A protein has these predicted regions:
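Positively charged n-region of N-terminal signal peptides that target proteins for export
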Residues: 1-5
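Bacterial N-terminal signal peptides
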Residues: 8-18
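Noncatalytic, solvent-exposed loop/strand surfaces
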Residues: 20-210
Length: 210
């Protein structure tokens, strides 16, 4: 999708409408390797063939959806006047109906990012009955699967190209990197409370150009 696209189109390509072979809870799947234990996937499709449903959503997001049961969860960044609304959504994977669509953070003015990035690029992490979403320096949040905000946290650091780091859960920790223009670091938050458990500096400055 080009950066001039004014909607986020979510296509579900399924050969069997009755169910799913397994959850897809994080970036690149259950193990983070991009492998799926699914057989008989469709090898061909077109604008009409093998499309169960198609949904257009306003905004632009490079994040991937995550799947738990028959529910899809995704993030979005929707322009709103001079600002940007940073949102999380739950979509029924069988019908395409939007169950809920919540604003979690708001940018009063759109910060500068790389022209190929979006303000909602990190993929959410689905951990049992909790959803973790990350918008870089704009904020990190934990939600129930019903859309209730459990906690929100924000680390104020100057981005260079915008965020692209998808968070991961390991034990009781939510992990992500914060690679900004100064003091880049790896953060570990208590996944239950959002409190910082530790912060480790990274000796890796983000390049101004690439």
């Amino acid at each position: 999708m080009s950066k001039t696209t004014l909607f986020h189109a979510l296509l579900v390509l399924l050969s069997n409408h009755s169910g799913f072979a397994g959850d897809w809870p994080q970036f690149r799947g259950p193990t983070g390797q991009g492998h799926a234990d699914i057989k008989n996937l469709p090898l061909r499709w077109s604008a009409t063939e093998k499309i169960i449903w198609k949904k257009k959503l306003p905004g632009t997001a490079w994040s991937s959806p995550v799947l738990g049961g028959n529910k899809l969860f995704l993030t979005n960044a929707v322009p709103d006047g001079e600002g940007v609304s940073l949102r999380a959504l739950r979509v029924d994977a069988l019908t395409g109906n939007v169950d809920w669509d919540l604003e979690l953070f708001r940018m009063e003015s759109a910060q500068r990012i790389h022209r190929k990035n979006s303000h909602a690029s990190p993929t959410p992490f689905l951990d049992d009955d909790r959803l973790y979403v990350h918008f870089g320096n704009q904020g990190t949040a934990c939600l129930s699967l019903a859309g209730k905000t459990i906690w929100k946290k924000r680390f104020d650091y100057p981005p260079v190209h915008g965020s692209g780091c998808s968070p991961v859960v390991e034990g009781d920790l939510l992990l992500f990197s914060a690679d900004g223009a100064r003091d880049p670091a790896l953060y570990a938050l208590d996944k239950h409370t959002g409190k910082t458990r530790w912060r480790t500096a990274r000796d890796a400055a983000a390049k101004k150009k690439f």
